[in-house]
Protein backbone atom coordinates (compact mmCIF):
# COMPACT_ATOMS: atom_id res chain seq x y z
CA UNK A 1 0.00 0.00 0.00
CA UNK A 2 2.94 2.34 0.61
CA UNK A 3 4.37 1.87 -2.88
CA UNK A 4 0.88 2.18 -4.35
CA UNK A 5 0.32 5.43 -2.44
CA UNK A 6 3.44 6.96 -4.00
CA UNK A 7 2.31 6.00 -7.51
CA UNK A 8 -1.19 7.31 -6.80
CA UNK A 9 0.19 10.69 -5.73
CA UNK A 10 2.18 10.98 -8.96
CA UNK A 11 -0.91 10.16 -11.05
CA UNK A 12 -3.28 12.32 -9.03
CA UNK A 13 -5.44 9.30 -8.22
CA UNK A 14 -6.73 7.51 -11.33
CA UNK A 15 -6.04 4.14 -9.72
CA UNK A 16 -8.03 0.95 -9.25
CA UNK A 17 -6.72 -1.46 -6.61
CA UNK A 18 -8.23 -4.93 -7.03
CA UNK A 19 -8.01 -7.26 -4.06
CA UNK A 20 -8.69 -10.97 -3.78
CA UNK A 21 -10.07 -10.91 -0.22
CA UNK A 22 -12.25 -8.62 1.87
CA UNK A 23 -9.57 -8.54 4.57
CA UNK A 24 -7.04 -7.19 2.05
CA UNK A 25 -9.64 -4.71 0.78
CA UNK A 26 -10.12 -3.24 4.25
CA UNK A 27 -6.42 -3.23 5.15
CA UNK A 28 -5.30 -1.64 1.88
CA UNK A 29 -8.18 0.85 1.99
CA UNK A 30 -7.25 1.93 5.53
CA UNK A 31 -3.55 2.37 4.70
CA UNK A 32 -4.30 4.24 1.46
CA UNK A 33 -6.64 6.64 3.29
CA UNK A 34 -3.97 7.29 5.90
CA UNK A 35 -1.14 7.77 3.36
CA UNK A 36 -3.20 10.02 1.06
CA UNK A 37 -4.85 12.16 3.72
CA UNK A 38 -4.64 15.83 2.77
CA UNK A 39 -3.48 15.06 -0.79
CA UNK A 40 -6.78 15.97 -2.46
CA UNK A 41 -7.06 12.40 -3.72
CA UNK A 42 -10.24 10.68 -2.65
CA UNK A 43 -9.92 7.04 -1.55
CA UNK A 44 -13.08 5.07 -2.29
CA UNK A 45 -13.41 1.68 -0.63
CA UNK A 46 -15.94 -0.91 -1.72
CA UNK A 47 -18.58 -1.39 0.96
CA UNK A 48 -18.46 2.19 2.23
CA UNK A 49 -20.83 3.42 -0.49
CA UNK A 50 -23.22 1.70 -2.90
CA UNK A 51 -21.45 0.27 -5.95
CA UNK A 52 -23.22 2.70 -8.31
CA UNK A 53 -21.97 5.72 -6.31
CA UNK A 54 -18.40 4.38 -6.28
CA UNK A 55 -18.45 3.81 -10.04
CA UNK A 56 -19.91 7.24 -10.82
CA UNK A 57 -17.51 9.10 -8.54
CA UNK A 58 -14.51 7.23 -9.91
CA UNK A 59 -15.53 7.88 -13.52
CA UNK A 60 -15.81 11.60 -12.78
CA UNK A 61 -12.09 11.45 -12.13
CA UNK A 62 -10.49 14.85 -12.36
CA UNK A 63 -13.43 16.66 -13.96
CA UNK A 64 -14.26 20.13 -12.67
CA UNK A 65 -10.76 20.56 -11.26
CA UNK A 66 -11.25 17.97 -8.53
CA UNK A 67 -8.56 15.50 -7.57
CA UNK A 68 -8.74 12.02 -9.01
CA UNK A 69 -9.76 8.96 -7.06
CA UNK A 70 -8.43 5.65 -5.89
CA UNK A 71 -10.93 2.83 -5.76
CA UNK A 72 -10.07 -0.18 -3.61
CA UNK A 73 -12.37 -3.03 -4.56
CA UNK A 74 -12.73 -6.80 -4.67
CA UNK A 75 -14.63 -9.41 -6.67
CA UNK A 76 -17.53 -7.37 -8.08
CA UNK A 77 -15.21 -4.83 -9.70
CA UNK A 78 -12.99 -7.38 -11.48
CA UNK A 79 -15.44 -7.37 -14.39
CA UNK A 80 -18.12 -5.10 -15.81
CA UNK A 81 -16.53 -1.87 -14.59
CA UNK A 82 -15.61 0.31 -17.57
CA UNK A 83 -13.61 3.51 -17.19
CA UNK A 84 -12.45 4.63 -20.64
CA UNK A 85 -10.16 7.64 -20.90
CA UNK A 86 -7.89 9.33 -18.38
CA UNK A 87 -9.87 8.63 -15.19
CA UNK A 88 -8.06 5.26 -14.90
CA UNK A 89 -4.34 4.98 -15.54
CA UNK A 90 -3.13 2.42 -13.00
CA UNK A 91 -4.53 -0.97 -11.99
CA UNK A 92 -2.91 -2.71 -9.02
CA UNK A 93 -3.78 -6.35 -8.30
CA UNK A 94 -2.76 -7.55 -4.84
CA UNK A 95 -2.54 -11.32 -5.44
CA UNK A 96 -3.23 -13.88 -8.10
CA UNK A 97 -7.01 -14.35 -8.28
CA UNK A 98 -7.33 -18.07 -7.61
CA UNK A 99 -10.79 -19.34 -6.65
CA UNK A 100 -11.21 -19.72 -2.87
CA UNK A 101 -10.37 -23.36 -2.06
CA UNK A 102 -12.87 -23.54 0.81
CA UNK A 103 -15.84 -22.52 -1.36
CA UNK A 104 -18.23 -25.54 -1.55
CA UNK A 105 -18.54 -25.33 -5.35
CA UNK A 106 -14.77 -25.11 -5.77
CA UNK A 107 -14.30 -28.06 -3.41
CA UNK A 108 -16.82 -30.13 -5.37
CA UNK A 109 -15.12 -29.37 -8.71
CA UNK A 110 -11.71 -30.20 -7.22
CA UNK A 111 -12.94 -33.51 -5.83
CA UNK A 112 -14.54 -34.42 -9.16
CA UNK A 113 -11.27 -33.77 -11.02
CA UNK A 114 -9.28 -35.73 -8.43
CA UNK A 115 -11.70 -38.66 -8.76
CA UNK A 116 -10.98 -38.62 -12.50
CA UNK A 117 -7.24 -38.73 -11.82
CA UNK A 118 -6.78 -35.15 -13.02
CA UNK A 119 -5.06 -32.17 -11.40
CA UNK A 120 -7.52 -29.67 -9.90
CA UNK A 121 -4.77 -27.07 -9.68
CA UNK A 122 -3.69 -27.26 -13.33
CA UNK A 123 -7.10 -27.96 -14.81
CA UNK A 124 -9.32 -25.75 -12.68
CA UNK A 125 -7.51 -23.28 -10.40
CA UNK A 126 -4.99 -21.96 -12.95
CA UNK A 127 -7.52 -21.57 -15.81
CA UNK A 128 -9.93 -19.75 -13.47
CA UNK A 129 -7.11 -17.45 -12.34
CA UNK A 130 -6.24 -16.76 -16.00
CA UNK A 131 -9.80 -15.62 -16.73
CA UNK A 132 -10.00 -13.45 -13.61
CA UNK A 133 -6.57 -11.91 -14.24
CA UNK A 134 -7.52 -11.03 -17.82
CA UNK A 135 -10.71 -9.43 -16.54
CA UNK A 136 -8.83 -7.43 -13.92
CA UNK A 137 -6.21 -6.27 -16.43
CA UNK A 138 -8.99 -5.46 -18.87
CA UNK A 139 -10.27 -2.70 -16.58
CA UNK A 140 -7.29 -0.61 -17.70
CA UNK A 141 -7.64 -0.61 -21.47
CA UNK A 142 -11.20 -0.02 -22.70
CA UNK A 143 -10.59 1.83 -25.99
CA UNK A 144 -7.81 1.87 -28.59
CA UNK A 145 -6.47 5.15 -27.23
CA UNK A 146 -6.39 4.08 -23.56
CA UNK A 147 -3.04 3.40 -21.95
CA UNK A 148 -1.82 2.77 -18.45
CA UNK A 149 0.14 0.61 -16.04
CA UNK A 150 -0.78 -2.78 -14.61
CA UNK A 151 0.99 -3.78 -11.38
CA UNK A 152 0.71 -7.38 -10.17
CA UNK A 153 1.92 -7.67 -6.57
CA UNK A 154 2.45 -11.42 -6.42
CA UNK A 155 5.95 -12.82 -6.85
CA UNK A 156 4.52 -16.21 -7.86
CA UNK A 157 4.23 -14.74 -11.37
CA UNK A 158 8.00 -14.98 -11.73
CA UNK A 159 8.87 -17.78 -9.31
CA UNK A 160 6.54 -20.54 -10.52
CA UNK A 161 5.81 -22.34 -13.75
CA UNK A 162 2.13 -21.50 -13.61
CA UNK A 163 3.07 -17.83 -13.12
CA UNK A 164 4.54 -17.83 -16.60
CA UNK A 165 1.27 -19.29 -17.92
CA UNK A 166 -0.62 -16.44 -16.31
CA UNK A 167 1.70 -13.79 -17.75
CA UNK A 168 1.41 -15.31 -21.24
CA UNK A 169 -2.39 -15.15 -21.00
CA UNK A 170 -2.39 -11.37 -20.44
CA UNK A 171 -2.92 -8.99 -23.36
CA UNK A 172 0.31 -7.95 -25.11
CA UNK A 173 2.13 -5.33 -23.07
CA UNK A 174 5.62 -4.25 -22.16
CA UNK A 175 6.87 -5.92 -18.98
CA UNK A 176 9.17 -4.25 -16.50
Give residue ranges: language-model regions.
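ASCE RecA-like P-loop NTPase motor cores
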Residues: 1-176
